[in-house]
């Protein structure tokens, strides 16, 4: 397996040296840790992830939990993993797609971002982008309503309500928007 230069120096491995059973065990351990770290880097290279999300994914892919935790800690210490930055990026992207604050909180929690970090990130993005949740609900509904215009009004109402509810908008906002777009029946 592969061994980092740091490990080779720390274990005092050099050509012609006698390697004890203890050193062989340490080499195996270091090799596994490096493999787990490399896998974590690869997963992080495909897309940004939250710390807990990455740790769970590594374990699900068969990495030992202790090594997954160590790899995540190392990446965080190196500045490659930052839940606050991830949450802001996630919130900005999802806000543009029309997700509500509540739905973003749920999605971030599912990815392992703690509630305080998620709320702070969402608040910052909402303030920076000047988003009003009722207006966002209205915009998303209007866009969706265009695809429903040929359907009977009861079907429009049901589908639009379900669509907005899945995005996590407040029931009062959803009801008002649906009533305005579909008309009261």
List the predicted regions and their residue ranges.
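An alpha-helical, amphipathic repeat domain used for nucleic-acid recognition
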Residues: 1-185
């Amino acid at each position: 397996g592969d061994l980092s230069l740091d490990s080779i120096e720390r274990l005092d491995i050099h050509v012609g040296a006698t390697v004890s059973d203890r050193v062989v065990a340490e080499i195996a351990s270091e090799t596994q840790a490096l493999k787990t770290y490399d896998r974590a880097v690869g997963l992080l290279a495909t897309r940004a992830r939250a710390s807990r999300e990455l740790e769970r994914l590594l374990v699900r892919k068969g990495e030992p939990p202790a090594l997954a935790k160590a790899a995540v800690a190392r990446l965080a210490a190196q500045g490659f993993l930052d839940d606050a930055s991830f949450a802001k990026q996630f919130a900005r992207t999802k806000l543009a797609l029309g997700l509500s604050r509540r739905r973003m909180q749920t999605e971030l929690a599912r990815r392992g971002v703690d509630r305080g970090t998620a709320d702070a990130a969402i608040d910052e993005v909402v303030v920076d982008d000047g988003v009003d949740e009722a207006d966002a609900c209205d915009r998303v509904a209007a866009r969706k309503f265009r695809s429903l215009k040929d359907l009977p009004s009861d079907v429009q109402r049901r589908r639009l309500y379900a669509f907005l509810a899945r995005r996590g908008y407040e029931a009062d906002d959803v009801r008002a928007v649906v009533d305005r777009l579909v008309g009261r029946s």
